[in-house]
């Protein structure tokens, strides 16, 4: 017997989330400008931690903007937070924990909260193959006039990487300079071309070294942030090609989409998740465009750290591979899925598959690995 995880999760209020986070170690919370609560990063800290763990109530998802760089639901958060304190719990135990803290019983004797294991497993398996409905979530938009504040000229850093003036102008890339703030500006638009956020590629060395290379831009008193897990960068420009070819290539960063715009022009069928994670919202957006093939092209894994043994590094590398398989599993019930993996040393550590040029990208495409349903389900 086990809890109905979806019913428990959907029933949670903001107050319930407060209770759960307080119990996990975040004694209070802050708020962002959109009214989303921000907690301490209990996901990867046993105590303390910065206020970089955001909760998006509509999506029922957390996002850690520091070490995790990842999206996850409340059950996964519980598993991670408990693990930081040396307590390993199962997924079902995490559901029970959440239900207990939130006081979810759904009736006398928990009759509605518990359901038969065999039945839920069968129905969940069958449910994977149902056609995904088109999504209708619309993110808040910002006034377009903010774009007039930016210097409308490309920065030499990106020009030096081979991105053309034409593409940088087409994607509205600019530059913002004020005391204590400097960086390349990257407007983000949704499928309907609405301005929903602006990210900044910092040019301040101290910020880059501290891990804040890409962050939401603040102009005056307005922070131009958005839920990146609910939008894919570049789709306002590439959706027609994606629909025409019925395929999509998913990168981590905006810059890779820009490079492919120069490589392929109107045949560019790429987008970017702006992290190393693919959310269910990303999947549903792409399925709504009718894709039949998905290519996952995340950055090459990091180099070994100082004093890290080869054995430990290989363990971490395998964990990264398993993570990619789990991301692929979001798509395998619906479409053909491929992963671009550099076995031949064509890329440097942390390179995007697009960073070494069109020929290298196409060589990686030729060597792509197809992921089956069983492989994606590890």
Swiss-Prot record:
Gene3D superfamilies linked: 3.40.1360.10, Zinc finger, CHC2-type domain
UniProt-listed GO biological process terms: DNA replication
GO molecular function: DNA binding; zinc ion binding
Stated name of the protein: SPbeta prophage-derived uncharacterized protein YorJ
Organism per entry: Bacillus subtilis (strain 168)
Gene: yorJ
